[in-house]
A protein has these predicted regions:
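Metal-ion/cofactor- or nucleotide/acyl-coenzyme-handling active-site neighborhoods
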Residues: 1-214
Length: 214
């Protein structure tokens, strides 16, 4: 059992925030191209091409998760695994695993460690306010290899629904970390195990943990 897990998204909100200290005090699960900048133990890449880049880039100590659909193509890499099965069954389109994205699967991977709490960091959901087209895409890797096909902000309704399902089917606390003025979906606010925190609050928590370990 792991006490704390941090699931790192790639929303613009985390730009400038140092996530490195989290590695010593949490089990870190990263999404997609985060491996270009950080050496993590666990990376989730549901996109086939992103998974290929990950296996070409990451060392053997990084476990890479991808969709069951692509898994057989990476059978020669011992550090590639299938994402876990969903903890529930539903009849809607957004309940089908193929319509789940990397962020939600990264959170599901985090749940496998049975932690006391999971930090959801930089899952920004919404497009950048006042910006249109690719400028409105809320992702620090936008425009780079593997992201050029994203021409406009993605409708976050599936993401909101799917994360909400994970909150519902888990025993742990979820701490959603974002900017002070970020709007958390109402459906998430209704969950008793979901809490909102700022980056400043997370930084204070990190310092407290690091002080404890000295």
């Amino acid at each position: 059992m792991t006490k704390f897990v941090s699931v790192i998204g790639n929303g613009e909100s985390r730009r400038g925030f140092d996530i490195t200290p989290l590695k010593g005090i949490t089990t870190m699960v990263g999404c997609n191209a985060i491996f270009r900048d950080h050496n993590l133990d666990y990376v989730v890449a549901c996109d086939r091409h992103m998974c290929q880049e990950a296996v070409n880039t990451c060392g053997k100590n990084t476990t890479i998760y991808t969709r069951e659909n692509w898994y057989k193509q990476f059978a020669f890499w011992p550090n590639v695994r299938k994402v876990p099965e969903l903890p529930y069954e539903g009849e809607k389109r957004q309940d089908e695993p193929f319509h789940w994205g990397t962020g939600q699967f990264a959170a599901l991977v985090g749940m496998q460690f049975k932690p006391k709490a999971i930090f959801l960091i930089a899952m920004d959901l919404w497009g950048i306010e006042g910006k249109k087209g690719t400028e409105g895409v809320n992702n620090i890797y936008k425009g780079s290899k593997g992201y050029t096909y994203i021409k406009r902000p993605v409708d976050p309704r599936y993401w909101i629904y799917q994360f909400n399902k994970l909150f519902e089917y888990s025993d742990c606390r979820w701490i959603v970390v974002n900017d002070e003025n970020w709007k958390m979906p109402d459906e998430w606010k209704d969950k008793k195990n979901v809490f909102q925190e700022s980056y400043e609050g997370l930084a204070k928590w990190i310092n407290k943990q690091l002080t404890k370990s000295k």
